[in-house]
């Protein structure tokens, strides 16, 4: 008994789906230290920070909307007497008008209204000067447009479609130093440059030219000497030299020159004179180059003065201006070169000493000094004017204009901002300790940038690597939306400033001042049409998740495809654990669009960081720390698969690790960190590929990209060989239904699950604890695939919080299931699998293994035209009865009708212009009053190539237009459905309430009540059963506390009913009110068709290892090769597809899949023999004991659960082989042995047609195959008479335009080569652009006369016209 208790107690810790079907984990590492983080965190967190919706106005942090408002407000009028201040904002009332589903149906944006509290302060103009007196304060809430909200799954619904805003990887603001790699100048000299990139504002570039002078550019304009900007900052020549150079001090006598010697500065120079020590011993001979050894000797000899000849001074540069003390005149300017003449002058004026700049080829070049000579400006004003001329060419400069322009460029918070990130990067790069500061530049900043740049030119320091992830940061949805919002606010600011300056501002309210249009327009434009706001890829749950985790280097403020070179696209060492090195598109975007790695996240500054386990004194701890690429370089980081003993100590003497971006071997005592998991470096899609470590990178890339194109099949099947990520993806993608609280399943049907919540989970006594989950049924996804959820729980099942209750598309018992497990044989088969073709068995079609449902949406819009309104009706001119058979009286197709290409879905007629009538027609009109002929048929028809079943019709009518029968019918049906749902919900909640009441009342002593309940009697269950439930509330109890609870329950009961009524009223109003349709639209009808697509030749299939192919033929089951026991294989692949592609993972997967299936078969046989739970438990134990880590605890399951588990394992025991930590060959062999299968993984096959055995054994096994969304039905296309191009009169191209096949230049050559003259003439005239000829030919065919007269092609006329446009008169001569 004790054992059973412990078992049931433990049972709760295993999740419900795992009890139903658990994977055998073949990973080697101990339990993951870090659970895979929530995969959509980046998106949701970023947008939450932007909205700060549920945070009180006072507590909001300085980012998102709040920051945008604070940066623009307060707005002051030009006079300064009126100020508009920002107080706070609120988002949406109680809830948004429509929920996500309704917004999708009605084509609306899921958004909340933004209301901003503003305060208008007016100052008294009559107040005495210097004192501001407030005259009036008005506060008001102003509506500022709608802000889109994010759905729970991280997407946005804009105009009825789900969109995703992709994060952008852009260059971080800050300062960067780089060189041109020797490309600019022919000599190959490296030209260094520095660039200050702000978050917003002007760019500032400093660069060297080939002559080593420094220049500055502002906003990529014409270059100026760099010292101009220093002068504009207020520095003079002496100060500039002082900042960049040390000086040498010389004493002048009439004959000699004496230098105050600093020995270090002599290094590398030629000794002009002998240098002797005090004893007269020569340390350095004349004309010898002075080395470091000489310098040590000079220092030892303590020589501090050195007499030198005059010519040593020639060419040296004066550091400080020299003034004649007697006359006050300047003898020599700072930065002047010393000549013999100047030296003579200095001696003549008895100058005793002078300072020269210490310039040395090795460590201190003459760059700034040379630049000063190029600089024509002499003072601050001239410098400002020079800058003004460059920025505003052609405008006359004034002192004020020049000053304000320069001030606004880099020093005004409105126009320039480095942002916190930029300031942090800037300070770190120029070597400051303090990482915070002003968002604008200061004088010191500009000087520091120049200093570092000069140092780099002198060989001290390195240039930056722009592709390092410490120099690129992530901009997510929230940040981009905030920037757009700010742009809108700045536009508003201008208008408000003008209005504040009006005379009657005192009579205005904040609402009259602010126009919300620019703000909502900016937001709308961003979410609707920005390059980074993309139509969500909704093929399957994986493609949704991947799309939300995508990181793009393109987009506004990013790179362009054409300009991006090889380096930006390449894998960088800092991508490790941050960005996936595998998953990126093939084609022009390769490397520019990446995917976040599994554990990566963005830090507060937007830099990607990845977690590591701390290692202290050789011992690996369980503590994890996130490091960004900047911090990571300073540590030794070991791999995840490093050998560790039981106590967590590092075992090996040398350990492979990463340090400063290099892979090295080092001793264990140096290790600081260790990876958290082997799959840390890859993205979600790549982490789903088993045996990824055995695949070539190119194929792995294709594999991870193709998984995203898999179409959800009707009966999803989880892979037999997975990686353990399947469950995480299915749960995080949001396609499944997850239990919010733990409890017991109360009722289940196809569209609703009701859970009675555990008592301990309910917050208060009022909470009766019922959770109702409504499932999504057969709705259309963005890619026209079908979204349908179905329950996996049964009544009475216990579920925990976070368990999966219902599967969605491509999920199977809470695990991702993109394809099907097929029995595959690697062998050629009559050439049908030549060049990657695939041969499949008819069984797959028969069992609907790859049948998919696609839902198409057709929309018909009736508009108001100039000639009158269009009408939706079944009365269509010139259309036979048969064509109208599927329409109802209102002209709309019935639900359930099967329609083919060309069938009418919605009948619509459009008024056509009155034509001139003949007298006879006029007479007929007058007699019969016939008006039918003045409308034309513009009905919505099924597009070519589609056959399907109508599954739903939606009608939206403009407010005030009479609704037709069908609309009322649909509304009535919807309303009754809603009412039923609400009543069911009420019933369930009331049942729970009365159940709780029964527990409360039973056994209590009554003080009276209905049905002559006497005082002092105990209340029994039978008494309550006889009493109508409503009357229970009339019972009076003696216990006060219980009475209070009874009263509270009564209140709760009333509340439930009121809530139901309010919801019903709300739904009724929503259903009956007309939609706000676009202007000029009267009615919109949407028809949904479900198309069932079986797999057929021409469809594209693929495995998970980049092994893709097209189905060449479908072979009857009896003709397929079969195994010795008679099992025919499902699919035959070409063995030649493996060696050159080097994706060996598929072979290992095949072997392991076969073992998994074999084990399942053995369990199935046991069940058929009637094995009981004990036997099943014993046979499952050795299988689950194969897990070295994360062992599944069979003991925790009760007997019925063991039986269910075994039944679910009959199709095969699912195995997980984690990425870079997967099953070894030995383990695969062991599993094959356990399944009684040959350990070679090969078996004898027999030819299905002859029954003969194939010569040698064939690799057979189970592989997971996907059907990709490249279906032959979507590509097949044939043109009859269709549309023509306007100018050339040639048929259009492409399936979408119902176009033809282009008969191009080369095809014409082919016919010419054959000499097929008539065919050629036909191709170039009547089949193309001979307008008269093709109409004649059509007529002839109708008349049964199959002749053609070729005429003049239209393209010839176009050519003639083009030549005429060159003013050459050219024309045809008619004979």
Swiss-Prot record:
Disulfide cross-links: none
CDD domains: RNA_pol_B_RPB2
Domain of life: Bacteria
Catalytic reaction annotation: RNA(n) + a ribonucleoside 5'-triphosphate = RNA(n+1) + diphosphate
GO cellular component: DNA-directed RNA polymerase complex
SUPFAM superfamilies (alphabetical): beta and beta-prime subunits of DNA dependent RNA-polymerase
Gene Ontology MF term list: DNA binding; DNA-directed RNA polymerase activity; ribonucleoside binding
Record GO biological process: DNA-templated transcription
Enzyme class: transferase
Keywords of this entry: DNA-directed RNA polymerase, Nucleotidyltransferase, Transcription, Transferase
EC number(s) stated in the UniProt entry for this protein: 2.7.7.6
HAMAP family: RNApol_bact_RpoB
UniProt cross-references to NCBIfam families, sorted A to Z: PRK00405.1, rpoB
PANTHER family in the cross-refs: DNA-DIRECTED RNA POLYMERASE I SUBUNIT 2
Subunit structure comment from the entry: The RNAP catalytic core consists of 2 alpha, 1 beta, 1 beta' and 1 omega subunit. When a sigma factor is associated with the core the holoenzyme is formed, which can initiate transcription.
Function (record text): DNA-dependent RNA polymerase catalyzes the transcription of DNA into RNA using the four ribonucleoside triphosphates as substrates.
Family, as annotated: Belongs to the RNA polymerase beta chain family.
UniProt protein name: DNA-directed RNA polymerase subunit beta
Gene from which this protein is expressed: rpoB
């Amino acid at each position: 008994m004790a054992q059973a208790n412990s078992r049931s107690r433990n049972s709760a810790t295993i999740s419900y789906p795992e009890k139903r079907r658990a994977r055998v984990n073949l990973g080697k590492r101990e339990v993951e230290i870090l659970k895979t983080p929530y995969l959509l965190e980046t998106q949701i967190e970023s947008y939450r920070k932007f909205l700060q919706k549920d945070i009180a106005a006072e507590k909001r942090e300085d980012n998102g909307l709040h920051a945008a408002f604070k940066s623009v407000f307060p707005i002051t009028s030009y006079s300064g007497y009126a100020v508009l201040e920002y107080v706070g904002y609120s988002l949406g009332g109680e809830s948004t008008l429509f929920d996500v589903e309704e917004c999708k149906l009605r084509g609306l944006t899921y958004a909340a209204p933004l209301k901003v509290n503003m305060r208008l302060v007016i100052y008294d103009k009559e107040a005495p000067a210097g004192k501001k007196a407030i005259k009036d304060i008005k506060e008001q809430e102003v509506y500022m447009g709608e802000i889109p909200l994010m759905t729970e799954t991280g997407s946005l619904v804009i105009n009825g479609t789900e969109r995703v805003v992709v994060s952008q990887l852009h260059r971080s603001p800050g300062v960067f130093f780089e060189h041109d790699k020797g490309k600019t100048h022919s000599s190959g000299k490296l030209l260094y440059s520095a660039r200050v990139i702000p978050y917003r504002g002007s760019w500032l570039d400093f660069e060297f030219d080939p002559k080593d002078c420094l220049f500055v550019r502002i906003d990529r304009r014409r270059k100026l000497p760099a010292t101009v900007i220093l002068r504009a900052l207020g520095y003079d020549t002496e100060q500039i030299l002082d900042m960049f150079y040390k000086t040498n001090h010389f004493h002048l006598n009439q004959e000699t020159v004496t230098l105050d010697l600093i020995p270090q500065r002599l290094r590398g120079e030629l000794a002009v004179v002998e240098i002797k020590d005090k004893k007269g011993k020569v340390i350095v001979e004349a004309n010898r180059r002075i080395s470091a050894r000489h310098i040590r000797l000079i220092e030892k000899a303590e020589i501090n003065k050195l007499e030198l000849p005059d010519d040593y001074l020639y060419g040296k540069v004066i550091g400080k201006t020299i003034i004649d003390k007697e006359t006050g005149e300047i003898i020599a300017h700072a930065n002047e070169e010393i000549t013999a003449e100047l030296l003579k002058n200095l001696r003549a004026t008895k100058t005793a000493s002078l300072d020269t700049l210490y310039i040395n080829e090795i460590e201190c070049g003459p760059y700034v000094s040379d630049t000063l000579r190029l600089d024509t400006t002499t003072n601050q004003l001239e410098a400002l004017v020079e800058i003004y001329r460059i920025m505003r060419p052609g405008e006359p400069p004034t002192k004020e204009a020049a000053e304000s322009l320069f001030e606004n460029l880099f020093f005004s918070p409105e126009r320039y901002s480095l942002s916190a990130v930029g300031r942090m990067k800037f300070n770190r790069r120029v070597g400051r300790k303090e990482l915070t500061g002003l968002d604008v530049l200061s004088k010191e900043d500009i000087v520091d940038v120049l200093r570092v740049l000069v140092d780099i030119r002198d060989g001290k320091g390195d240039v930056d690597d722009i592709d390092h992830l410490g120099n690129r940061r992530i901009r997510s949805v929230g940040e981009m939306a905030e920037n757009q919002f700010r742009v809108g606010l700045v536009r508003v600011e201008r208008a408000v400033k003008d209005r504040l300056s009006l005379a009657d501002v005192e009579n205005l309210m904040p609402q009259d001042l602010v126009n919300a249009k620019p703000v909502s327009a900016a937001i709308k434009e961003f979410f609707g049409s920005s390059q980074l706001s993309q139509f969500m890829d909704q093929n399957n749950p994986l493609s949704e998740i991947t799309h939300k985790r995508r990181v793009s280097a393109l987009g506004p403020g990013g790179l362009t495809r054409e300009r991006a070179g090889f380096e930006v696209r390449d894998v960088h060492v800092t991508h490790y654990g941050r960005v996936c090195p595998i998953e990126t598109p093939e084609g022009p975007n390769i490397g520019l669009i990446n995917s976040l790695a599994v554990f990566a996240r963005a830090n507060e500054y937007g830099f990607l960081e990845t977690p590591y386990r701390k290692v202290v004194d050789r011992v690996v701890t369980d503590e994890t720390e996130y490091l960004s690429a900047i911090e990571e370089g300073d540590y030794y980081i070991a791999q995840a698969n490093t050998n560790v003993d039981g106590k967590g100590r590092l075992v090996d003497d040398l350990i492979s690790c990463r340090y400063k971006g290099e892979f090295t071997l080092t001793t264990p005592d140096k290790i600081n960190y260790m990876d958290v998991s082997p799959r840390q470096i890859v993205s979600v899609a790549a982490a789903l590929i088993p045996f990824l470590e055995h695949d070539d990178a190119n194929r792995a890339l294709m594999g991870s990209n193709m998984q995203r194109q898999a179409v959800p099949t009707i009966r999803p099947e989880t892979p037999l060989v997975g990686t353990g990520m399947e469950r995480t993806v299915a749960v995080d993608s949001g396609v499944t239904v997850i239990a919010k609280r733990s409890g017991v399943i109360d009722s289940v049907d196809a569209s609703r699950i009701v859970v009675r919540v555990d008592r301990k989970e309910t917050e208060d006594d009022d909470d009766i604890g019922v959770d109702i989950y409504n499932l999504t049924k057969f709705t259309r996804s963005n890619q026209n695939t079908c979204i349908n959820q179905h329950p996996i729980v049964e009544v009475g099942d216990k579920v925990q919080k976070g368990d999966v209750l219902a599967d969605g598309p491509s999920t199977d018992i809470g695990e991702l299931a993109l394809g099907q497990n097929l029995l595959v044989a690697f062998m050629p088969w009559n050439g049908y699998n030549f060049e990657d073709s695939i041969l499949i068995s008819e069984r797959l079609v028969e069992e609907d293994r790859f049948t998919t449902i696609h839902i198409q949406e057709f929309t018909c819009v009736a508009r108001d035209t100039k000639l009158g309104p269009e009408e939706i009706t079944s009365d269509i001119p010139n259309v036979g009865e048969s064509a109208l058979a599927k329409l109802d009286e209102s002209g709309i197709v019935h639900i359930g009708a099967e329609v083919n290409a060309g069938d009418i879905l919605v009948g619509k007629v459009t008024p056509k212009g009155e034509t001139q009538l003949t007298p006879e027609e006029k007479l007929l009109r007058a007699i019969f009053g016939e008006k039918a002929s003045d409308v034309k048929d513009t009905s919505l028809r099924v597009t070519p190539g589609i056959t399907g079943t109508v599954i739903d019709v939606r009608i939206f009518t403009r407010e005030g237009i009479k609704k037709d029968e069908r609309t009322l019918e649909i509304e009535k049906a919807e309303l009754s459905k809603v009412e039923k749902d609400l009543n069911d919900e009420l019933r369930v909640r009331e049942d729970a309430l009365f159940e709780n009441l029964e527990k409360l009342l039973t056994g209590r002593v009554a003080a009276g009540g209905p049905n002559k309940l006497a005082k002092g009697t105990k209340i029994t269950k039978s008494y309550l059963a006889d009493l109508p439930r409503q009357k229970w509330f009339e019972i009076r109890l003696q216990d006060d506390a219980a009475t209070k609870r009874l009263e509270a329950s009564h209140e709760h009961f009333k509340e439930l009913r009121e809530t139901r009524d309010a919801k019903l009223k709300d739904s009724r109003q929503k259903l009956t009110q007309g939609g706000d349709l676009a202007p000029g639209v009267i009615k919109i009808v949407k028809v949904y068709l479900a198309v069932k697509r079986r797999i057929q030749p021409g469809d594209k299939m693929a495995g998970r290892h980049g092994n893709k192919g097209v189905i060449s033929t479908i072979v009857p089951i009896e003709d397929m090769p079969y195994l010795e026991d008679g099992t025919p294989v499902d699919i035959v692949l070409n063995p030649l597809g493996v060696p050159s592609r080097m994706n060996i993972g598929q072979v290992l997967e095949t072997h392991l899949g076969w073992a998994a299936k074999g084990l399942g078969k053995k369990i199935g046989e046991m069940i058929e023999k009637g094995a009981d739970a004990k036997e099943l438990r014993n046979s499952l134990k050795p299988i689950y004991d194969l897990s070295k880590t994360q062992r599944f605890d069979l003991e925790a399951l009760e007997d019925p659960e063991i039986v269910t588990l075994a039944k679910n394992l009959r199709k095969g025991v699912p195995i997980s082989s984690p990425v870079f930590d997967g099953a070894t060959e030995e383990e695969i062999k062991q599993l094959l042995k356990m399944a009684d299968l040959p350990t070679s993984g090969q078996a004898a096959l027999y030819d299905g047609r002859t029954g003969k055995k194939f010569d040698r054994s064939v690799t057979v096994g189970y592989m997971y195959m996907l059907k990709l969304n490249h279906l032959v039905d979507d590509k097949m296309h044939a043109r009859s008479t269709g549309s023509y191009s306007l100018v050339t009169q040639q048929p259009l191209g492409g399936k979408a335009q119902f176009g033809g096949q282009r008969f191009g230049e080369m095809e014409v050559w082919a016919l010419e080569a054959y000499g097929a003259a008539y065919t050629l003439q036909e191709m170039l005239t009547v089949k193309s652009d001979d307008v008269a000829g093709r109409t004649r030919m059509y007529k002839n065919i109708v008349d049964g006369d199959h002749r053609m007269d070729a005429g003049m092609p239209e393209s010839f006329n176009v050519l003639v016209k083009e030549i005429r446009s060159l003013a050459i008169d050219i024309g045809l001569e008619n004979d």
